[in-house]
Amino acid sequence: MQTAVDETNKYQRQNATSNIGKTAAWYDTTMEELYVFFDTTILMGLNQKNRIKDYWSTDKLITTPIFGELFTRDRYLSILRYLHFADNNTEEESKLRKIKPVMEYLRAKFERAVTLWENLCVDESLMLWKGRLGFKQCIPSKRHRFGVKLFMLCDCDTKFILNFIVYTAEQKQKSTIIQS
């Protein structure tokens, strides 16, 4: 998580073109603040609204006061704008270079959480994605037809993901599903 804090603060300094407007109020984020940011984002998934700004609305019909208690709207949007997990100055050419630290962190946590059992399966999954992305896939037979294709190694008994590969349609997949 400290890497995300450092890279977010660095990315903001690299891209703050002027001290005018909402970026003038930027102050470096902390690990505690990023934890609250991710908690808020998960809470938004549980209480869905049409626009991000609606979570901080004072309209009596759609108000949700918890979001205002966790963050101001402008601070949340600032962190969302500058959130970064990897250094932009790296020479790596992979399409996943910006989220590679997160993927490696998740793989390590998955590996520590569960030991391998006998009943394993490799599953293809499509994670919904509506934005622009160079490796977005279209699979007409899936419920969400457009998204990011994943191959996951799962334990059939516990339903736990042991490892995963994000399909990017690159010539060589550098990561392997079963690590030695």
Each language-model region and where it sits:
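N-terminal initiation segments
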Residues: 1-179
